[in-house]
Amino acid sequence: MALDLTAYFDRINYRGATDPTLDVLQDLVTVHSRTIPFENLDPLLGVPVDDLSPQALADKLVLRRRGGYCFEHNGLMGYVLAELGYRVRRFAARVVWKLAPDAPLPPQTHTLLGVTFPGSGGCYLVDVGFGGQTPTSPLRLETGAVQPTTHEPYRLEDRVDGFVLQAMVRDTWQTLYEFTTQTRPQIDLKVASWYASTHPASKFVTGLTAAVITDDARWNLSGRDLAVHRAGGTEKIRLADAAAVVDTLSERFGINVADIGERGALETRIDELLARQPGADAP
């Protein structure tokens, strides 16, 4: 069954052109990132993310108006772009952002897209699923050049066995992840997503995270801590309790929390997390 592009365009409020060009690619990345939130509520509640078919992803992110994590966002975007005539390859990445230099090598639990189209002159990277630091523009697969986006600049650097993606965060180049351009079959991504959504030590199982992007800000939620990052600085807000967290997920991040089931069960699970979060006794 083909993906329902009309439903997807309605979900992201897109009314523009659909021919496979760089302008259309930029527009889709922009509106997708501003409309469909990043969230990990399914893994948090013990629901594996192991069906990455176009039907399953469209059902959750489009029809049920939920968000998702990288395998869902980039999975859906890849299907959409392929339907529009782009050539899409799926890559795997190893997230190293905020890791200590001597930390153990992490598994490849991230995915991104390599996209080409008539006249592209090369490959563009598309990643609408990196949560709080999602690139808001397609990036040329070209090392060394600083590439502006609708938010902060990014750049790619060579590594012996591939590339690293870096972002300018607080006036410092920070490495987000390492990747190669080896095309990954769907089964590899399914296994990685199952691991990320079920392993007891996975951050998606042990903690709550959500993110959404606006024209001038990045809104990131980690547990009860809400951060609003703008060019002029960061505003930090500590939410009072689980009820406030659920309200924020619904009202600020646009997540259809009613789709998840009993609100009480979600609040109970979040309460468990907040009790373990540093500074849990502080309002």
UniProtKB/Swiss-Prot annotation:
Active site: residue positions: C70, H110, D127
One GO process term, biological-process aspect: response to antibiotic
Thermal behavior of activity: Is thermostable. Retains >95% of its activity after incubation at 60 degrees Celsius for 30 minutes.
Superkingdom of this protein's organism: Bacteria
Reactions catalysed: an arylamine + acetyl-CoA = an N-acetylarylamine + CoA
Record-listed E.C. numbers: 2.3.1.5
Biological function: Catalyzes the transfer of the acetyl group from acetyl coenzyme A to the free amino group of arylamines and hydrazines. Is able to utilize not only acetyl-CoA, but also n-propionyl-CoA and acetoacetyl-CoA as acyl donors, although at a lower rate. As acetyl-CoA and propionyl-CoA are products of cholesterol catabolism and the nat gene is likely present in the same operon than genes involved in cholesterol degradation, this enzyme could have a role in the utilization and regulation of these CoA species.
Name under which the protein is recorded: Arylamine N-acetyltransferase
Species in which this protein is naturally found: Mycobacterium tuberculosis (strain ATCC 25618 / H37Rv)
Taxonomy of the source species: Bacteria, Bacillati, Actinomycetota, Actinomycetes, Mycobacteriales
